[in-house]
Amino acid sequence: MSIIVANGLTHWFGSEVALESIDLAIDAGEHMAVLGENGAGKTTLLRILATAARPTSGRLQIMGLDALRERKRLRARIGFVAHAPGLYPALSATENLEFFCTLQGVRKTKVAETLAIVGLSEVAKRPAGQLSRGMQQRLAIGRAILHDPKLLVLDEPDASLGSDGADLLANLMRGRTVVLATHDHALANRLCQRTLVLRHGRSVGTPTRLHLVQ
């Protein structure tokens, strides 16, 4: 069963095309890496797949729903780690997750468990603005999994995570459908079964089995 089906996804910023005619089909439980240089369109594609942005044209179905019409319903089923963590710097790590619990209708008892999973129990009371870049990234990842989403959309989640970052991501991705943007081909090869290469907003060929991409 395909969790994501995209046809002709195109996005313009003014007179500049950021994404052009992208077709995708991603099955349940599949992990796909999106590769490309800066400005290739990776972030734009992931924001659209996370329902954080609308394409200028094209069709997108996620979990059988029209993603352009059912964004609110789908956001409860999608975990999104954006390119920037997007945390509340004055709130503690715990308070950031508790606030998200309130928005998503998640039990706050899950907060301590989630902080432990991402390795932040010892800094639970520290303001997010005082955390290191790697810790902030871990907190953003924790927020993305707090509501146990079926689909994870991760924009360079490995940034500043440290030596055990790949292990953390592998554990969190298990049993979920994942779209992951990264510059790290070794990480993509370890975590994903397929890759989509973007160049100037266009797909370079069709999504490929990763062992063919060097």
Residue ranges and their predicted role:
Residues 4, 19-21, 75:
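Conserved structural motif at the start of ABC-family nucleotide-binding domains
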Residues 35-37:
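The feature captures the beta-strand-to-loop junction immediately N-terminal to the Walker
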Residues 50:
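Helix-to-loop junction immediately C-terminal to a conserved catalytic motif
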Residues 58-66, 74:
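Conserved ABC transporter NBD signature motif
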Residues 98, 102, 108-123:
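Conserved ABC ATPase "signature" region
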Residues 152-156:
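Catalytic Walker B motif of ABC-type/P-loop ATPase nucleotide-binding domains
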